[in-house]
Amino acid sequence: MPSADPAAPGNKRGRSIVLFQDATFLAICDWRNALNCSLPNSRIVPVALASLLLATGCTGTRIAELLRSETPHERYVERLQQVGLDQTALGGDWIEASIRVLEEAVEVRAPYEEVSYLDPSAAHARGYRLSLKRGQRLTTSFELKGDTTYQVFLDLFLKRDSTSHPILVSSADSLSNTLDYVIRRSGEYILRIQPELLRGGQYVVTVKTFATLAFPVSGRDTTAIQSVFGDSRDGGRRDHHGVDIFAPRGTPVVAAARGAITSTRDNRLGGKVIWLRDDLGRRHYYAHLDARLVTRGRTVEAGDTIGLVGNTGNARTTRPHLHFGIYERGVGPSDPYPALYQPPTDAGGFQGDPAVIGSLVRVSRSDARLRGRPSDGGQPEAELPLYTQMRVEGGTGNWYRVRLPDGTHGYVVASATESADQPVETTVAAAEAPLLSGPTGGALETARVVRGEELPVYGRFGTYLYVATPRGQLGWLPF
């Protein structure tokens, strides 16, 4: 099918040379091993300042202070430092948890809703990993249950690679309840949730994605797209830099976003075309129009009719359609589909028992599996023997998000678990032995069991039993 791509060979208007791509992000790193990075909001970085950034690297806070405001999480870390709490065991654990969770984040897919719990007596954070596309809008809502007098910090990071620290791209706290961000670079993102030190409780987090553009052909949606971004053109010599939306001649073409009409010139490939620059700086390209109904300089709102579907330009031998493209400074053409597609938004709610969130449970049947995400599809992470003990950290749909005693985390279907508040059997100590804080060889001894003592068993993990002594002490006993 013919292409109206303005960046095709011979069409110089679509080409540009830029010093910095917005995808580079010019991250300014934070005080601790480049953990927290941020993006300048400005689209233009003065050359002198850019040279300074390149010369100094991602090293200090002085440059960061020039370019951006601190996030709520960073301000809280500074307060901990000012009073010396970062040097305490608990304060250090809190900071380490904020770093560690970026590697331990569980994979989720929007729409996603989870009921979760953060233990106020421990230094914890939660992480959720999502794959997102340029042009999508990510909206995260957060609701505390019970006490709402403390802050919970929400931070969104872009994961670069296995050796680089993720880049902080957006932040909020529970006072605003919502984190809203338009994705400017496709990739893996990590949502971190962390409460103030010694605060916590149950919360509900909801993650959804939305289109950022109205569909540009009236009465149609993405099912009318019949040629997609990246399709081969001219025998493989170039790619299709847009999507083709088919509709009868004369169907209204509407503005996909609020913006200014910047050009209404004809060109050889697109025939009658319109260029629109939206409020995010994206340039929209509408081609093969039968007629234009706007003029250069006019400001339009999303949904305003700006033209009519046709087949002018190099589409004159094909059925009428709109070629729609998006171009961004420093990026060039980008796939419009994620910005146009409106995905489902119903997360389905939580069908498990909210009372067990934050509590210990155990496997109640022999076919239980630990999975990397809340779905029966894919290879299970591990087989879970009967009575395996775990702590429920959250719930979504009919799944519990759990952490095993060795720190492994994942999802277990709720119906394969039961409360661990009653013993499943009783064992008798064959000899005096240590009662341990965990089911590992390096765990601390917390008590001793005496030979001949009857010990109720509440769960298992590996070669250890979770037992209670006659004196009410709980711990792990090798068997």
Show where each model-derived region lies.
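Acidic, Ser/Thr/Pro-rich low-complexity intrinsically disordered segments
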Residues: 59-63, 70, 74-75, 118-175, ...
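Short histidine-centered loop motifs in beta-beta connectors
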Residues: 264, 280-303
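SH3/SH3-like beta-barrel superfamily modules
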Residues: 190, 382-413, 447-478
